[in-house]
């Protein structure tokens, strides 16, 4: 997994301070770690937006003004309901051997049998919550869809973990991740064959 350096500035929590930060192109955020005091910081909105909207998960080295780097990942991001701008972010610090839960984007590999038959591929879960060491986390969680047929789905429990030793998927086991929908044409053709 790629490591990104992101500069942060400590901030003071005061009434209306968050709105002033946002107007000046900064995003209020917090940095926390088990057993340590939460630190309020601000981050350049443009840099954070690029990072959040990339299709990969990252380990982030937060760089403080004194030059210290603290290894973290994004735990939560809050968006404005109308403008979709980032209004707040939470970063979780971690140590090398610590077990954490992290959201990782899903990507697919292979050509689905069902799509070749005219079906439509639908990714239902665009990300999965994985538990393990942050250094074991992939940038993408790749799922092979080669055997996925028409009107079938791949559920969380059916995803092989051989390429991801030491990681566990924390999402609901019965949740569908990817499906191939039969189009109206395929449904009508199946009905004609059945009659």
UniProtKB/Swiss-Prot annotation:
GO biological process: one example: translation
Keyword Ribonucleoprotein appears in the UniProt entry: yes
Domain of life: Bacteria
Signal peptide positions on this chain: none
InterPro entries: Rbsml_bL25/Gln-tRNA_synth_N, Ribosomal_bL25/Gln-tRNA_synth, Ribosomal_bL25_b-dom, Ribosomal_bL25_C, Ribosomal_bL25_long, Ribosomal_L25_dom, Ribosomal_uL5_bac-type
Record keywords: Ribonucleoprotein, Ribosomal protein, RNA-binding, rRNA-binding
Family, similarity comment: Belongs to the bacterial ribosomal protein bL25 family. CTC subfamily.
Protein name: Large ribosomal subunit protein bL25
CDD domains, sorted: Ribosomal_L25_TL5_CTC
One GO cellular component term noted in the UniProt record for this chain: cytosolic large ribosomal subunit
NCBIfam families: bL25_bact_ctc (TIGR00731), PRK05618.3-2 (NF004136)
One Pfam family named in its UniProt record: Ribosomal_L25p
Assembly: Part of the 50S ribosomal subunit; part of the 5S rRNA/L5/L18/L25 subcomplex. Contacts the 5S rRNA. Binds to the 5S rRNA independently of L5 and L18.
